[in-house]
A protein has these predicted regions:
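Glycine- and acidic
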Residues: 190-197, 229, 236-240, 305-318, ...
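C-terminal motif of bacterial Sec signal peptides marking the signal peptidase cleavage site
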Residues: 18-21
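C-terminal, non-catalytic "cap/extension" segments appended to globular domains
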Residues: 25, 30-52, 84-86, 125-129, ...
């Protein structure tokens, strides 16, 4: 869990920032964001080049020291949840936030300064654009924004739906209903019930947008959306179009999946509930936000779905425990030529849930000292899911170790989609062939079960793509003032129908604020990174399989045992954020442009099957 570069200036503080965790065509005009995003300062305020260089060096030293302290305090909190550790972590986060805020404000003094060397210019932009929600310079407005941010998160965290009989359901309980129920009336009640928590957020969110835009303009950006997009090594105005180009590449596969799923749902619920040729009602897809459709697998699965093995049962039969599962993950990376993990990793990580205290069980990878104090924190169960998650989390650790030689601001992924993509890429290599090489399978199963495996992955990964794209498309339009509070909800559903082919199940109330029912909106967490991670992981996987000499379909490829693949992967990882992400991408794939066609290659057998199933069906949506 690398503490990235996001914190906002002193006299202003506020709401704790979320930690920030790209794109394609080779003809895109990539250029340093510092040349494209920041308003030029009056000549009288321009500081000397040497002063700028010294400022950056001093800022890195200060932020690195505070970040390491905060990382240690956060680790203690995650492993020992008490009132005292919460207070210590909050104080540490406040100190780090204040320092970052001060640094961002100071960095804006150098706007428009010519003659800067590459690293100084790049790092100045990082210091300014790394803040998620910039506060205005006015202390009263800063305090107001801090209070709004805390209130929005609190409203979401305390949210629940209370039925007429007085019984109240928290989000987790409502999510269980969405995942398990097949009663459309019950699903609709749970879906609409959760959205009763968000209307009260709308005026607060609208005010937060005003304040954050003011803060962004004071740092030299047109608005907050421009500031967020400035982190992608290209003209922020061009970035949304580049994302749409990626979406256009993969949308035929999504539309085929959508067509099949809608037809099967119509068979289950009837055409009155699921009209032909229209958007799928959002409450029927097994997830509170219709962002993942895994929970309706049995309704849409191909007829031949057996994988031929039960990995959870095999792991238990073979006597695996938490440590041996992590050792197996480490051995995967060793087979690629990476060094073994340090002894401190095994001494300091959390692998199983303690019996004597509460801990944060959500799996995460940590880099405490930004050198070699690597750790993971998991409450590992011996099952197939955690076996995959371990490989994913170790991918973060090896990425963190690879870029440790870079300076503080460059110790991060090439863009905020790369870190998650690397973890997911390595999880794609957990194939039957890999399991056979480990001795967990006697032989590699034939391809008869591949469609079922691919369908499960598509319901997780392909269904997510349009949602991952549209959340920030909505926010950017809000930040740019293209729509006011009265139009927030209408725009939200316009974008959901345009990209997802998913619609609200009925008219929404006039005061509805459905974006607020998704944590990342009131929590102010940028979302494009998740879309990018889904695209990148398949592009990485295809390139690594080619480097490894794989001749099988890429959904059956594992790079286990390939030193050549490991060398190319490390060449990208060790760059960190020192170069524009197209350079890092080219170091691995040979091309600087993101390319979603790797997804089409991976899911080609499923696409062919879907096209057969959809013959004669009315696909698309109005």
């Amino acid at each position: 869990m690398h503490m990235t570069h996001l914190i906002r200036p002193v006299a202003m503080v506020a709401a704790l920032l979320t930690l920030t965790a790209c794109e394609q065509p080779s003809d895109a005009k990539f250029k340093p964001a510092s040349e494209t995003t920041v308003a030029e300062a009056p000549a009288a305020t321009v500081q000397g080049v040497e002063e700028a260089r010294e400022f950056v060096a001093a800022s890195e030293t200060t932020l690195e020291r505070l970040a390491q302290h905060h990382e240690r305090v956060s680790w203690v909190l995650a492993n020992f949840i008490t009132d005292d550790t919460e207070l210590l972590a909050a104080k540490s986060a406040e100190q780090f936030t204040l320092a970052q805020v001060a640094v961002a404000a100071e960095a804006a003094r150098f706007n428009g300064l010519e003659g800067l060397d590459y690293d100084t210019a790049r790092k100045l932009n990082m210091l300014k654009s790394g803040i998620v929600i910039p506060a205005p310079m006015d202390p009263e407005k800063t305090a107001e924004q801090s209070e709004i941010g805390a209130n929005l998160k609190g409203m979401y965290g305390r949210g629940s739906y209370c039925r007429e009989d007085g019984g109240c359901l928290a989000l987790g309980e409502l999510e269980d209903i969405m995942a398990e129920s097949r009663d459309p009336a019950e699903l609709l009640e749970a879906w609409a019930g959760w959205r009763t928590v968000s209307p009260a957020m709308k005026p607060l969110y609208a005010r937060q947008v005003e304040l954050a835009n003011e803060g962004a303009r004071e740092l030299g950006f047109d608005d907050l959306g421009t500031m967020w997009r400035s982190a992608y090594d290209m003209d922020p105005a061009e970035f949304p179009g580049e994302l749409d180009k990626l979406w256009e590449q993969v949308s035929p596969l999504y539309e085929a999946l959508h067509c099949h799923v809608r037809a099967r749902l119509a068979e289950t619920y009837g055409s009155e509930v699921v009209p032909a040729g229209g958007p799928i009602p959002a409450h029927l897809l097994g997830n509170m936000w219709a962002q993942s459709w895994e929970n309706i697998y049995e309704l849409v699965a191909p007829p031949q779905t057996a994988a031929g093995y039960d990995l959870t049962a095999i792991l238990n039969d073979e006597g695996y425990d938490a440590i041996s599962m992590v050792k197996t993950g480490e051995a995967f990376f060793s087979s690629l030529g990476f060094e073994e993990l340090p002894e401190t990793f095994w001494e300091r990580s959390l692998f199983v849930k303690p019996a004597d205290r509460d801990v944060v069980c959500h799996a995460s990878a940590w880099d405490i000292d930004e050198q070699d104090d690597l750790r993971i924190k998991m409450c590992i169960d011996v099952n197939a899911e955690d076996f995959k998650v371990i490989h994913h989390e170790l991918g973060h650790n090896y990425y963190q170790r690879a870029y440790k030689g870079e300076s503080y601001l460059y110790r991060s992924s090439a863009n905020d989609g790369f870190h998650e993509a690397v973890g997911d890429t390595l999880a794609l290599s957990i194939t039957p062939e890999y399991l056979a090489k480990l001795g967990l399978l006697d032989e590699v199963p034939d391809a008869s079960g591949d469609l079922g495996l691919l369908m499960r992955q598509a319901l997780e990964k392909i269904s997510f793509l349009p949602f991952g794209l549209m959340v920030d498309q909505w926010r950017w339009k809000v930040f740019a003032g293209e729509v006011g509070p009265d139009g927030y909800n209408e725009l939200w559903w316009q974008l959901r129908e345009r990209y997802q082919g998913v619609g609200a199940p009925g008219d929404r109330p006039a005061d509805a604020f459905d974006p607020g029912a998704k944590y990342h909106v009131p929590g102010n967490t940028p979302y494009t990174r998740y879309f990018l991670a889904q695209i990148l992981q398949f592009q990485f996987h295809r390139a690594l399989c080619e480097i490894a000499g794989n001749e099988d379909p890429i959904h059956r490829c594992s790079i286990y045992g390939s030193n050549q693949a490991g060398e190319r992967l490390n060449a990208m990882l060790e760059m960190g954020r020192s170069k524009p992400w197209p350079d890092a991408l080219a170091a691995l794939t040979g091309s600087p442009g993101m390319d979603a066609t790797a997804i089409l290659d991976y899911f080609a057998p499923l696409q062919a099957w879907l096209d057969e199933q959809n013959a004669g069906r009315q696909c698309g949506w109005q």
